[in-house]
Amino acid sequence: MFKKLFNKLSGKNIESMSFMESMNLTELPVVTFYQEDKKFNFLLDTGSSDCIIDKNILDQIEHEESDLQSNLFGLEGKRRLVKACRICLSYKGGQYEYDYLISDMKDAFTNIKQTTGVTLHGILGSKFFNTYKYVLDFDKMIAYSKV
């Protein structure tokens, strides 16, 4: 309740993230996050449980490497042990700090870029939505917070 009141008084609405523009242009739910003036596009993927960052952009994004490792299953069904890092991103003044699995997504993201024109830097999976209590509404084309 306090969060909603603060956001209303400050003029900030960080409780919803629109993916309408990306859906209209590319038919993919993509949200752009920021680190200062740098933009990073993330695919909202409820089919993935984990968040993934493309290892090829780690030199462009502030992150803290962690000792955490996890198994990552690719689309081909193969399991790989990958490292993780913590990344803090912002959206409309809200801060989102989360652990991302580091994976080489170059081929997949290049394919998406060639077919849709959108440059992706990572994937937000269902654990992110659960942590931040977000629900995807494809009628309104927003991700909104239940809190």
Residue locations for each model-derived region?
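Pepsin/retropepsin-fold aspartyl endopeptidases
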Residues: 1-147
